[in-house]
Amino acid sequence: MSTTTYRSICGEESLPYIDCDRCIRALYARLQHYVQQDRGDCPICAYFREKIGSRDGSESDARLLLHAQVNVVYELFARHADQEALALLERIEDDCC
């Protein structure tokens, strides 16, 4: 009986993994940027201000927030037409979740 693994499908090519922690920190920083730039007219930013609250922004906080709120994060980046952040979010969903 053989086991199917990623390596058995891809062969010996280098694995296309990303540095999940670094990418999550970058995406969290982008989220914080939009929240900080908000002048009070973005309900999504207000939502995240409440969710972030007094959290310290540690990796575990960032990871939990992004995983739990992925659809709302997507909506925020889509509203700002931030294609780079949207692509990174998709990559994090695929490779890190």
From Swiss-Prot:
What the entry lists under Pfam families is as follows: CowN
Q: InterPro entries per the record?
A: CowN (IPR024899)
Q: Which residues, if any, are the signal sequence?
A: none
Which keywords has UniProt assigned to this entry?
Answer: Nitrogen fixation
Q: Which GO terms describe its biological process?
A: nitrogen fixation
Family classification: Belongs to the CowN family.
Q: Enumerate the HAMAP family for this protein.
A: CowN (MF_02117)
Please state what the protein is called: N(2)-fixation sustaining protein CowN
Record the organism. Answer: Azotobacter vinelandii (strain DJ / ATCC BAA-1303)
